């Protein structure tokens, strides 16, 4: 789990997301509170529950981007899901308890990677020995092995083909079956490979011919797993999920009940009712054992264009006590998005054209013009936030992108006049821009 202070978390988010200081502060404090709880001991630690967050703001203002960056910062089991993917328990579709099962799988993957790093040196030596066996045979003399080992480490044999045999786990693509009417059927799915073992892909794998370069990674993973206690990894991962798991629940506004709508609402209000115990704290049965959700942090977000937060069930509103409102983006925000963020759209466009040998530069007034056009189209057509910049920029670069292979070695300067020539007429014609921008 991360030990960053709230200030450090906010400054890290600032590198990728413009503005939205309140939302950044809220998630930074929530993340730091996870660490603070770990420092407590005794009964008090069990009593400290996470303060779940509801982020409200128009589309394209940074809600989802905050979740993406938070996933990398958290250093804890983190899952981002859309609320619209789920249906009420008892209907065809995924029920919300699948969130916890998926989070456990994420936690196991994180814990396994962490443990693999701790045995990396031993696994490296074992993988190297297996590659040498494939190259020179297990009966080769020590001098021959040493000679090939030197060449292998120097990278001289990377393109040479060898035959290796990997122990294949149960195929992951097998269909999953629900058990209807069985207590704990929420446990969900039984993997046929687990039940029938070797009959459907046991430990014996068939030989494969691959290059030495391609053989290294799977052999390393297999040798690492031989050195690890898989049961201990699962137990630690489940404990980590229960204590530090974070779920980002996107598009929560889409599960608000619509006024005047009758009949069963299996993917709206029914999903809200199913979310209540999950967020409040319950025990979910998974194939790795029961998982308690009492200390999992839930961050919900939604645009609330058609509905409003008060349309959520009152009980669900109460379980999301921290409200954060994200502000719509201004012209200055758009300008900063284009120039200040790491891997900004302009940097990406310049780098992509450079691969064709075309040097593209944007003047200051071109950046201003792009920002202004994006804001104008958002206000006159439909406000889709920062995503509008991608549409406008693609329109501006359309001709250059198409002819770039024939223009290698050229330099192209894009100024405000060029931007206006490409998109101004469309931006001013509201009817036309509805379809093109």
UniProtKB/Swiss-Prot annotation:
The identity of this protein, by name, is ATP-dependent protease ATPase subunit HslU
Q: What does this protein do?
A: ATPase subunit of a proteasome-like degradation complex; this subunit has chaperone activity. The binding of ATP and its subsequent hydrolysis by HslU are essential for unfolding of protein substrates subsequently hydrolyzed by HslV. HslU recognizes the N-terminal part of its protein substrates and unfolds these before they are guided to HslV for hydrolysis.
Alphabetized PANTHER family for the sequence? ATP-DEPENDENT CLP PROTEASE ATP-BINDING SUBUNIT CLPX-LIKE, MITOCHONDRIAL-RELATED (PTHR48102), ATP-DEPENDENT PROTEASE ATPASE SUBUNIT HSLU (PTHR48102:SF3)
Which GO biological process categories is it annotated with? protein unfolding; proteolysis involved in protein catabolic process
- Which SMART domains does this chain map to? AAA, ClpB_D2-small
Quaternary arrangement and interactors, per the entry?
A: A double ring-shaped homohexamer of HslV is capped on each side by a ring-shaped HslU homohexamer. The assembly of the HslU/HslV complex is dependent on binding of ATP.
Query: Where is it chiefly localized?
Result: cytoplasm
The UniProt keywords, alphabetically, are: ATP-binding, Chaperone, Cytoplasm, Nucleotide-binding, Stress response
Q: Does the record's keyword annotation contain Cytoplasm?
A: yes
Please list the residues that bind ATP. Answer: 18, 60-65, 250, 315, 387
Pfam families recorded for this chain?
AAA_2 (PF07724), AAA_5 (PF07728)
List where in the cell it is found: Cytoplasm
Q: Name one GO molecular function term.
A: proteasome-activating activity
Q: Which organism is it from?
A: Methylobacterium sp. (strain 4-46)
Q: Which InterPro entries match?
A: AAA+_ATPase (IPR003593), ATP-dep_Clp_protease_ClpX (IPR050052), ATPase_AAA_core (IPR003959), ATPase_dyneun-rel_AAA (IPR011704), Clp_ATPase_C (IPR019489), HslU (IPR004491), P-loop_NTPase (IPR027417)
User: Superkingdom of this entry's organism?
Assistant: Bacteria
Which residues does UniProt call coiled coil?
A: none
Output the Gene Ontology cellular-component terms. Answer: HslUV protease complex
Residue ranges spanning the membrane: these are none
Similarity comment: family membership: Belongs to the ClpX chaperone family. HslU subfamily.
């Amino acid at each position: 789990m991360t030990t960053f202070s709230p200030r450090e978390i906010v400054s890290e988010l600032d590198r990728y997301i413009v503005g939205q200081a309140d939302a950044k502060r809220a998630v930074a404090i929530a993340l730091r509170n996870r660490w603070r709880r770990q420092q407590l001991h005794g009964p008090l630690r069990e009593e400290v529950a996470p303060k779940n967050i509801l982020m409200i703001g128009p589309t394209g203002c940074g809600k989802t981007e905050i979740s993406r960056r938070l996933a990398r910062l958290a250093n804890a089991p983190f899952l981002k899901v859309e609320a619209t993917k789920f249906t009420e328990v008892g209907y065809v579709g995924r029920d919300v308890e699948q969130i916890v099962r998926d989070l456990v799988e994420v936690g196991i993957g994180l814990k396994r990677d962490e443990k693999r790093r701790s045995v990396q040196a031993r696994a490296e030596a074992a993988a190297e020995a297996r590659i040498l066996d494939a190259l020179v045979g297990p009966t080769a003399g020590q001098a021959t092995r040493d000679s090939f080992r030197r060449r292998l480490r120097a990278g001289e044999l990377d393109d040479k083909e060898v035959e290796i045999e990997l122990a294949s786990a149960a195929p992951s693509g097998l269909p999953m079956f629900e058990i209807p009417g069985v207590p704990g059927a929420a446990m969900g799915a039984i993997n046929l490979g687990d039940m029938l073992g070797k009959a459907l892909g046991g430990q014996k794998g068939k030989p494969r011919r691959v290059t030495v370069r391609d053989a290294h990674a799977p052999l390393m993973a297999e040798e690492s797993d031989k050195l690890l206690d898989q049961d201990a990894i699962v137990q630690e991962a489940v404990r980590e999920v229960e204590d530090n798991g974070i779920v980002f629940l996107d598009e929560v506004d889409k599960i608000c009940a619509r006024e005047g709508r009758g009949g069963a609402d299996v993917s709206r209000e029914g999903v809200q009712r199913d979310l209540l115990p999950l967020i409040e704290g319950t025990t979910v049965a998974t194939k790795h054992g029961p998982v308690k959700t009492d200390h999992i942090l839930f961050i919900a977000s939604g645009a609330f264009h058609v509905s409003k937060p008060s349309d959520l069930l009152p009980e669900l509103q109460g379980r999301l006590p921290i409200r954060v409102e994200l502000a719509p983006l201004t012209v200055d925000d758009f300008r900063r998005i284009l120039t200040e963020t790491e891997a900004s759209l302009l940097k990406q466009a310049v780098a992509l054209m450079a691969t064709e040998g075309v040097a593209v530069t944007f003047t200051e007034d071109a950046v201003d013009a792009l920002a202004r056009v994006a804001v104008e189209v958002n206000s006159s057509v439909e406000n889709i936030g920062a995503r509008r910049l991608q549409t406008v920029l693609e329109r501006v670069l359309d001709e250059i992108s198409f002819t770039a292979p024939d223009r290698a070695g050229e330099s192209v300067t894009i100024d405000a006049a060029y931007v206006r020539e490409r998109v101004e007429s469309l931006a001013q014609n509201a009817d036309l821009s509805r379809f093109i921008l």
